[in-house]
């Protein structure tokens, strides 16, 4: 490896900090850290690095971007003023470094938070290299890209980059079969919503973090009041699923998390409720019944189920089902999705699929999709972090 570059790594979750530490164990260069909340700072006590918190005192008030489409605001994690202040504080912090990170790489998991957006805009203005990280949703694989995640990724803008990077053709059928089986046999998803006591403890931690943020003058990636921690749920876990015959002709709609970036930002409808209506309209136009499956990581379950129940009461051609995703894909006539991994699974299975949102999975050819899976994704598990020298070399090569 050539001389290792200094990395400025943005972290917002415990998973981020674990992966950072695993990466650091095999990395030859220095890594400094920007914290999007105080919980990550606590988790990295003892980690040898420069640690930064974008305090309000750093805010550059001359920078006034439009924050109306930023995830933290749309998801209700921050209000308008908090979102703008967080952006300005990150910009001001980075500007205070002067030339310290001119030849560094900003490492930005997800890219969705306002702090990530500010870091991205600042890096672009200084021509600083960036590396983004996202879950691949295939166990044992992680996505890295120099321009962004989802529809901001370099390969979304230009799927033909995959042909330039990997000019030799590969056996797409073999790759599709391998990854379809990998997903089909996945028993749990790492980001699945935890319930009961674990969920309360997680919310309690964020509410305490909110108190600390206010005490030191800082806007993190979310603010959560104590009252929200113990807010009473209306419907609990009781919900009646429809009994269905999978031999009937139907269109399958796998729901995404209502606060997902794909729903709030990358889908023009802007809400899961609108997506449900659009999916039903598409099914009706093809004389198909719509089978809907909830997302297991949905945190706003009561709100989503209320909408589902309203639609069941209003229409006779919608069913809410509990069968496995693989069964529903196999037996459906067609699938409609916003931009979920299920859409990719359908491509792998050769099933007709319609995407409501912006999606690389829709734009890529079969060969490009196979190269993405087999060559572009890095075989390292973000949630079970063991990172080798070879993994790091492959990741950093993507900076091209």
Q: Which residues are covered by each model-predicted region?
A:
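N-terminal subdomain of nucleotide-sugar transferases
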Residues: 1-53
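Active-site and donor-binding regions of nucleotide-sugar-utilizing enzymes
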Residues: 10-11, 18-22, 65-165, 343
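A donor-sugar binding/catalytic signature common to diverse glycosyltransferases
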Residues: 108-111, 115, 322-367
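Leloir-type glycosyltransferase catalytic cores
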Residues: 154-202, 365-400
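Catalytic donor nucleotide-activated moiety binding site of glycosyltransferases and closely related
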Residues: 277-320
């Amino acid at each position: 490896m050539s001389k290792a570059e200094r990395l400025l790594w943005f972290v917002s979750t415990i998973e981020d900090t674990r992966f950072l530490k695993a990466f650091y164990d095999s990395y030859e260069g220095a890594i400094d850290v920007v914290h999007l909340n105080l919980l990550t700072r606590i988790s990295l006590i003892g980690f040898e690095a420069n640690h930064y918190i974008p305090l309000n005192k750093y805010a550059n008030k001359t920078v006034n971007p439009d924050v109306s489409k930023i995830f933290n605001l749309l998801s209700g994690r921050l209000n308008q003023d908090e979102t703008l202040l967080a952006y300005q504080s990150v910009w001001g912090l980075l500007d205070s470094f002067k030339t310290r990170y001119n030849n560094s790489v900003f490492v930005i998991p997800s890219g969705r938070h306002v702090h990530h957006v500010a870091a991205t805009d600042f890096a672009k203005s200084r021509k600083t290299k960036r590396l983004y990280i996202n879950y691949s949703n295939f166990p044992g694989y992680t996505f890295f890209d120099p321009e962004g995640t989802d529809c901001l990724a370099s390969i979304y803008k230009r799927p033909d980059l995959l042909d330039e990077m990997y000019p030799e053709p590969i056996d797409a059928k073999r790759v599709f079969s391998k990854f379809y089986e990998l997903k089909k046999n996945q028993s749990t998803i790492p980001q699945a919503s935890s319930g009961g006591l674990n969920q309360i403890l997680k919310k309690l931690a964020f509410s305490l973090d909110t108190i600390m943020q206010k005490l030191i003058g800082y806007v993190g990636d979310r603010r959560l009041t104590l009252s929200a921690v113990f807010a009473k749920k209306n419907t609990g876990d009781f919900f009646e699923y429809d009994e269905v015959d999978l031999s009937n002709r139907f269109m399958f709609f796998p729901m995404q998390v209502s606060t997902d970036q794909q729903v709030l930002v990358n889908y023009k409808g802007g809400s899961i409720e609108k997506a449900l209506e659009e999916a039903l309209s598409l099914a009706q136009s093809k004389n198909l019944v719509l089978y809907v499956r909830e997302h297991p990581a949905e945190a706003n379950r009561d709100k989503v189920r209320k909408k589902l129940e309203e639609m069941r009461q209003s229409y006779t051609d919608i069913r809410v089902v509990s069968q496995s995703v693989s069964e529903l894909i196999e037996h459906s006539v067609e699938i409609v999705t916003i931009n979920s991994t299920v859409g990719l699974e359908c491509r792998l299975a050769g099933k007709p699929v319609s995407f409501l949102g912006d999606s690389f999975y829709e734009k890529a050819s079969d060969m490009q999709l196979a190269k993405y899976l087999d060559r572009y994704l890095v075989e390292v598990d973000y949630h079970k972090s063991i990172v080798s020298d070879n993994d790091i070399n492959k990741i950093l090569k993507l900076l091209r």
